[in-house]
Amino acid sequence: MRFETLQLHAGYEPEPTTLSRQVPIYPTTSYVFKSPEHAANLFALKEFGNIYSRIMNPTVDVLEKRLAALEGGKAALATASGHAAQFLALTTLAQAGDNIVSTPNLYGGTFNQFKVTLKRLGIEVRFTSREERPEEFLALTDEKTRAWWVESIGNPALNIPDLEALAQAAREKGVALIVDNTFGMGGYLLRPLAWGAALVTHSLTKWVGGHGAVIAGAIVDGGNFPWEGGRYPLLTEPQPGYHGLRLTEAFGELAFIVKARVDGLRDQGQALGPFEAWVVLLGMETLSLRAERHVENTLHLAHWLLEQPQVAWVNYPGLPHHPHHDRAQKYFKGKPGAVLTFGLKGGYEAAKRFISRLKLISHLANVGDTRTLAIHPASTTHSQLSPEEQAQAGVSPEMVRLSVGLEHVEDLKAELKEALA
């Protein structure tokens, strides 16, 4: 089935008791076992089923199956936020003494999580240059490297990594490539797994949920990576919490997603609630329709901003002058997301003054809403970084970031024109 059909139907058939057409919300903590044997089998991972909603919930299960279908993956795991998803993904593969190789073209919160929080746990994150070439990742990789990390579109640098080349190099080295595909809109604009990525993460808060109403995240497992190569002892060695069970022997290429759920999610507890999952599912039903309008408005505004005398530059991969425009065509089929950045000629103060004049456009720290959003990254999302780190992440003092919504584009232009005056 095609994306537009999957976003409505994947992962759910009317449940037999009420025959509800809409996915029911299951606000329960726990589930009655059929027998002592049934309970024992569930806890021993001899069969799958519901035990406790920190690990699995029927409403959340529909979301996971639907997202996996949209991304072309084999399984998914929903989490309480996008940050929770990436933390869970990395700590499922890496432990103290291990390392991750990452692009520096990251959302500011991710950069801080990598540089500060993971370091405190003994996991080193090694950063490439902003060029994020495969040879840079290879040069930083050793026997303790557990993953390579990129964003499908860097936030807010708006670079597009060469996913095919990175995935090929990673697999030749036996390393899992993980792609934060939040800007890929749930797989509608881009499916990294199809280009060779092993895992995908999402902040479902953004375009998938799409209405600024709920915080949620997810990991999608492509089920296509050979974890047995010797690089992933956390997946191949006997599991002390399950009487020496070897996950790769029991679950094969799904060993990662099983461990993330029954070990990581069980112990760390970053579970998504059923109501939040249902809100994301409701947003997901119109994802393809919203995505088209988001991209159309963004491209229109990017061209318009280029013509404004107060604007020094405009950065959007859909513009012909963008250094990764060819990759936007290859990977995103000419629809590279709904975020653009631009610089004001007056620098830092001009950017803050512009933000203060906005009325229709919301000044807040989010992207992927139905409404258009604006922020000044240097003084907010990336303010915890040094000037050198900001520059490395693609942030400059004069930069404004726009997450373009679904409003009529002429109304957005009128708002921007007034704020620029």
Curated annotation (Swiss-Prot):
Top-level taxon of origin: Bacteria
Thermal dependence summary for this entry: Optimum temperature is 70 degrees Celsius. Very stable at high temperature. 90% of the activity is retained after treatment at 90 degrees Celsius for 60 minutes.
Entry keyword annotation includes Heme: no
Needed cofactors: pyridoxal 5'-phosphate
GO molecular function, one term: pyridoxal phosphate binding
Catalytic activities: O-acetyl-L-homoserine + hydrogen sulfide = L-homocysteine + acetate
Pathway: Amino-acid biosynthesis; L-methionine biosynthesis via de novo pathway; L-homocysteine from O-acetyl-L-homoserine: step 1/1
Enzyme class: transferase
pH dependence: Optimum pH is 7.8. Shows high pH stability over a wide range of pH (pH 4-12).
Free-text activity regulation comment from the record: Inhibited by the carbonyl reagents hydroxylamine and phenylhydrazine. Also inhibited by methionine and propargylglycine.
Keyword annotations from UniProtKB, A to Z: Amino-acid biosynthesis, Methionine biosynthesis, Pyridoxal phosphate, Transferase
Modified residues (N6-(pyridoxal phosphate)lysine): K206
EC number(s) recorded for this UniProt protein: 2.5.1.-
Biological process annotations from GO: cysteine biosynthetic process from serine; L-homocysteine biosynthetic process; transsulfuration
InterPro entries reported for this sequence: Cys/Met-Metab_PyrdxlP-dep_enz, OAc-hSer/O-AcSer_sulfhydrylase, PyrdxlP-dep_Trfase, PyrdxlP-dep_Trfase_major, PyrdxlP-dep_Trfase_small
A GO-annotated cellular component: cytoplasm
NCBIfam families: OAH_OAS_sulfhy
Summary of the function given for this chain in its UniProt record: Catalyzes the conversion of O-acetyl-L-homoserine (OAH) into homocysteine in the methionine biosynthesis pathway. Has weak activity with O-acetyl-L-serine, O-phospho-L-serine, L-serine, O-succinyl-L-homoserine and L-homoserine. Shows low CTT beta-lyase activity and very low CTT gamma-synthase activity.
Family: Belongs to the trans-sulfuration enzymes family.
Record text on subunit structure and interactions: Homotetramer.
Record protein name field: O-acetyl-L-homoserine sulfhydrylase 1
Gene: oah1
